[in-house]
């Protein structure tokens, strides 16, 4: 079986390599390693993410951490929440641009500093291997919608009045990016937005989530030409 602890995160095929039992133990090990009492966590649009998130948070709460769940978000929204609300720890359930059968966990300490193979992940792995399987019990977390605050933060870097009317094509790849885009660009009515694949769907039915692959950009490229858009 492949090792799930990588150089920069935890990642594997679900459920063969990464499952809910392992996510629970990782949650406990993470809090035990950092020795903190608060955590913010989010998850992406993959089909396995909600269940892995619940299991991970069951582990963090079992270690006594007050846990805030911001739900389905992009990784940038989790990073924003960790820094803006001064949490001492954060976690994102995501496999980034990997194929649908994968999932993973990004672990971060305060000031949005990620744990890696050179800083923290080996210690979390050592603790993880000592923790027994998950017991049954209620999940006690606090839910929070952070999209409005995230949008205000993003827009604080620009002068909205200086934005010229444009036609823009956006492809969210059926991930969580469409949610943060809608929250932000709702405040820029001078832009005409053409939305592609904005409905979160962990099957990634239209193309894969990795935008570096040319075949995953063909749809947006064609739409930019079709709409006569300024950019995409």
Labelled PLM ranges:
Residues 21, 25, 73, 123-126:
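Short alpha-helical interface patches
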Residues 39-103, 184-232:
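N-terminal small/polar loop signature for handling phosphorylated ligands or for N-terminal nucleophile
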Residues 103-227:
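Gly/Ser/Thr-enriched, mixed-charge loops and adjacent short helices
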Residues 11-14, 44, 73, 106, ...:
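Gly/Ser/Thr-rich beta-alpha loop segments that engage phosphate groups in nucleotides
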Residues 19, 74, 115-119:
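General structural signal for secondary-structure boundaries
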Residues 8, 96, 170:
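Single, functionally critical "micro-switch" positions that shape active/binding sites
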Residues 1-58, 62-64, 143-167:
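An N-terminal, well-structured beta->alpha segment
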């Amino acid at each position: 079986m492949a090792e799930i602890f990588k150089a920069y995160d935890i990642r594997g095929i679900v459920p063969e390599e990464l499952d809910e039992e392992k996510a629970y133990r990782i949650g406990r090990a993470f809090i035990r390693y950092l020795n903190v009492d608060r955590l913010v966590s989010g998850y992406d649009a993959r089909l396995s993410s909600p269940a892995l998130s619940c299991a991970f948070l069951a582990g963090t709460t079992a270690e006594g951490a007050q846990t805030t769940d911001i739900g389905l978000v992009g990784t940038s929204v989790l990073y924003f929440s960790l820094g803006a609300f001064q949490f001492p720890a954060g976690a994102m359930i995501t496999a980034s641009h990997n194929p649908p059968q994968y999932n993973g966990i990004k672990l971060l300490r305060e000031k949005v500093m990620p744990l890696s193979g050179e800083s923290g992940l080996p210690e979390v792995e050592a603790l993880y291997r000592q923790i027994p399987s998950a017991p049954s019990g209620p999940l006690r977390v606090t839910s929070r919608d952070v999209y409005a605050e995230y949008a205000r933060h993003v827009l604080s870097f620009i002068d909205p009045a200086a934005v010229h009317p444009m036609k823009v094509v956006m492809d969210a790849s059926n991930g969580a990016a469409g949610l943060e885009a809608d929250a932000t660009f709702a405040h820029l009515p001078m832009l005409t937005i053409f939305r592609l694949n904005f409905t979160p769907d962990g099957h990634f039915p239209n193309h894969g989530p990795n935008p570096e692959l040319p075949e995953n950009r063909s749809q947006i490229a064609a739409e930019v030409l079709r709409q006569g858009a300024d950019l995409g």
